[in-house]
């Protein structure tokens, strides 16, 4: 059964990049919905209950941090990948504090998104609870 994914970003170009990366990666990941803002993403996630939500940090109506918090509260089995053009440590910490499983920098998204999702799912199904993957390496290595 393929991994179901919701993609949320107000920038259509990044939604298209994510769509391309996941399609090229394999047929084991399928996008079941896309949203252009946080409110739309939350409603979609509630409806389809995806395995993973990939969300931008900065979006209208509900930002990625608040979206992540709400997903954690309402859909605890759903994993969250937070992506952003901001790379400063403060944003990585906000992502981690909000409950995001993975933080991916948009500057390196083409090389880090799919491996980060695979690592996340591997840890989830192996029962591992290691630190969240952030841009392809563990959070403890980033600290």
Spans of model-derived segments:
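Two-component/phosphorelay signaling modules centered on CheY-like receiver
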Residues: 12-33
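Acidic catalytic/metal-coordinating carboxylates
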Residues: 37-40, 63-66
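Active-site beta3 strand of CheY-like receiver
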Residues: 48-54
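Receiver (REC) domain active-site loop signature in two-component systems and cognate sites
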Residues: 59
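Alpha4 helix (beta4-alpha4-beta5 surface) of REC/receiver domains from two-component response regulators
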Residues: 66, 87-104, 108-115
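The C-terminal output helix
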Residues: 118-138
């Amino acid at each position: 059964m393929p991994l179901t994914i919701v993609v949320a970003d107000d920038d259509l170009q990044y939604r298209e990049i994510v769509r391309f990366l996941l399609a090229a990666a394999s047929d084991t990941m399928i996008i079941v919905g896309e949203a252009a803002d946080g409110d739309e993403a939350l409603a979609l996630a509630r409806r389809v209950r995806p395995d993973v939500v990939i969300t931008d940090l900065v979006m209208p109506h509900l930002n990625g941090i608040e979206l992540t918090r709400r997903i954690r509260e309402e859909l605890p089995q759903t994993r969250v990948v937070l992506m952003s053009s901001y790379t400063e440590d403060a944003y990585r910490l906000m992502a981690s504090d909000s409950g995001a499983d993975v933080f991916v920098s948009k500057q390196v998204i083409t090389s880090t998104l799919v491996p980060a999702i695979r690592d996340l799912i591997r840890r989830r199904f192996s029962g591992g609870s290691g630190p969240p993957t952030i841009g392809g390496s563990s959070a403890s290595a980033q600290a």
